[in-house]
């Protein structure tokens, strides 16, 4: 299950993402105006309250906590496409979106960053591609210096987490 879906079930994120303004100005615009790779838009949702677990049978948390959430569409990489997306175009799209995600987090003063799999699960995106893009900005470009902690979504996407860990360990 995608990280955003888990957050929607465990917090008030869903209500924030379904505000009439966002539906009218972001989702509807995205459907009409973007190509097959979707939109580069990011939705910043500050102060979302996580109040229950994301277990099969959810359990209320004894101490709810707040997080800021960045929502950004991952390009849909369907390996069964009639016309595959050129690898350069796909890499450019991931690089652009990952840079935007990190810059929005930095601009809003995020101390901690949890890296989702960004399409490496249900969308079949190459873990090496996504991990490589994160590494480029976090390590090579020094974006990691803006955060106190950078964590992986430990509960999901082991294949992606291994690729990310391997690339992040190659720090110079």
Give the positions of each predicted feature.
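Macrodomain-like recognition of ADP-ribose-binding/processing modules
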Residues: 1-113, 117-172
């Amino acid at each position: 299950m995608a990280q955003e879906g888990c957050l929607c079930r465990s917090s008030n994120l869903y209500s924030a993402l379904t505000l009439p303004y966002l539906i009218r100005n972001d989702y509807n615009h995205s459907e009409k105006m973007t190509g097959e790779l979707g939109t580069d838009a990011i939705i910043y949702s500050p102060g979302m309250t996580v109040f229950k677990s994301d277990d099969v049978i959810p359990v209320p948390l004894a101490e709810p906590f707040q997080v800021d959430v960045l929502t950004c569409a991952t390009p849909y990489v369907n390996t069964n496409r009639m016309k595959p997306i050129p690898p350069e175009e796909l890499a450019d799209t991931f690089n652009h979106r990952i840079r935007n995600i990190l810059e929005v987090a930095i601009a809003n003063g995020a101390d901690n960053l949890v890296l989702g799999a960004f399409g490496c699960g249900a969308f079949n995106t190459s873990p090496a591609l996504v991990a490589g893009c994160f590494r480029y900005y976090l390590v090579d470009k020094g974006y990691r210096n803006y955060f106190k902690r950078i964590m992986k979504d430990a509960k999901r996407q082991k294949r992606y987490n291994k690729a990310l860990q391997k690339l992040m360990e190659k720090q110079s």
